[in-house]
Structures are given as structure tokens and as C-alpha cells.
Amino acid sequence: MAKESHVAAATRVGALPMYLDNPAGVTALWLHLAARLRARGLGPIADTPLWPQDYLAHWRDPALLFTQACGYPLVTALVHQVRVVGAFHYSVPGCDGAMCRSQVVVRATDPARALADFRGRRVAYNSTESQSGYNSLRALVAPLVRDGVFFDSHLQAGSHQRSVIAVRDGQADIASIDCVSLAGLRKHVPAVTRGIRVLCESDPYPGLPLITSASTDDATLATLRGVVADAVNDPDLAALWQDLFISGFEPLDEAAYRSCSAMQDGALALNYSAL
């Protein structure tokens, strides 16, 4: 007679780690989603969200059930390594449904009025792997380059907040900021954004992808999409969604993020590989 298996199912983990200015709201959202996912038969699921320091390791975790990623790594480092659940809609300037535009910010006192005026100036960005902070700005600047160069120097700040501070304090002249991040900074830490203004916006691209492990099966993927859609439409959670700027959810797949690849390819075709 076959022996009964006592191997426990691995605990699935989740996070919403990309917008860090409202951790209480993010934690509350995860608790609601985790409870609904357990009620649909998924589990065991971690009681609290992760706050990863190594994003690539987190996104590649085989125990990953649900998290946010960035569109640029999705089409580069994460190809065939995750599955896309969809994207939230955000009710902030620069967002339209699941699509968004980066906000290019400069000091309010800077007399420049066009992107071309920043030739030879200093740019700040959060990471070279960022769609909003790097890839979209590179695509926007690419038609203006001469011999593969536009900016005189650059500063890798490490986060959108630090990029904004660098511009505000004169350590850099211009930066491209995720529109939801900028709205969150203005709401939760307004002192950071005083003294800056939006110069222009990038071309549109899909917002942060909600992803799951590549090993997640089709049935579980459908459950994830259904649970998130139901939660977004739950009037009892309206205050939470408003606090997080979330106004909807749209199922998407990897193909929706081809525009991120197109931005990279377009810049490279114009001999512009690095800001």
C-alpha cells in the first residue's frame, strides 16, 4: 500500500513593493487580497507582504504568487521567467487606464522650457533597469542626440524619491519619474516635491505589471485575475483604493509590454544606448 504523503505545500508569497510611500496602505491591500485568495482555495499564503531588497531574486522566486514588477525588466531579464496577471489603473496625472507616461521633472526656477534645452546638463535616474526612470526617458531623448550623447553627466540616485531630491537640490537638472510615484510623493512627503515642476511627459506604456511565478498554472492565473478584479470593484474597499490611487484593474499578458522593448530598440537604432 502506498504511503500517505505528509509533505506540506510551500507557502506562496506576495508583495506590492514598487510604491513605498504608503506602506500601511500596501499592507492593508495585501491582507485583503490574501484573504480572498485563501477563500478561493489558494494557499498556504504568507500573512504579510514581502518588502524585497533584491527585486530580481524576488520576481524569480518559485514561491511567488503575486507581486508588482517593472515593465523594462519584464521584457529583458524576466523573459519567460514570470507570468503577467495584469495592471492596475491609477487615477493620477499621466495615467489613462492601464497606460501611463513618465513625468519629466526639473527645478521650478530653471528657465528651460523644452527637453532640447537640457543638452549638456546632468540627468538623475533611479536605475538603469527602470522603465519609467530610464528606458522611457532614453527613448524620449534619443531623437535629440549627437554622436550618441545628449547629457553631459548622470547620477544613479537609487530611487525616484532620491532622483527628485537630486533635481530639487541642484545635484542634477532633470529626471524622469513614475507618475504614480510622483503623485505619492506629493501626497505623503510633499516637501520632497516643492520646488520642482513637470517639464514634459514620455510616450505611453503599460503601467507596472502584476506578475506571478512562471510555474503558476492557468487556473490559478485566472483566479488571481478574478480576485483582483472583484476586490477593485468592492465598494467596501473604496477608501483603500482611493488612498492608493487605484481606480481599476485590467488583465494583460506579456505581449502588452512590447512597447517597452520598442522604446529600447528605437533608442539603440539611433545610437543612444545610455543616458
Residue ranges and their predicted role:
Residues 1-81, 90, 97-100, 236-275:
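N-terminal hydrophobic or amphipathic helices and topogenic motifs
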Residues 12-36, 97-163, 238-239, 243-247, ...:
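Bilobed "Venus flytrap"/periplasmic-binding protein-like clamshell domains
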Residues 153, 159, 206, 227, ...:
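Surface-exposed, charge/polar-rich loops and edge strands
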Residues 52-57, 160-166:
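Short, hydrophobic alpha-helical packing/hinge segments within bilobed ligand-binding/sensory domains
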Residues 43-51, 65, 149-159, 197-198:
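Short beta-strand-to-loop elements that line the ligand-binding cleft
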Residues 69-79, 143, 168, 173-193:
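A ligand-binding cleft/hinge motif common to bilobed small-molecule-binding domains
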Residues 86, 94, 100-101, 190-226, ...:
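Periplasmic-binding protein-like
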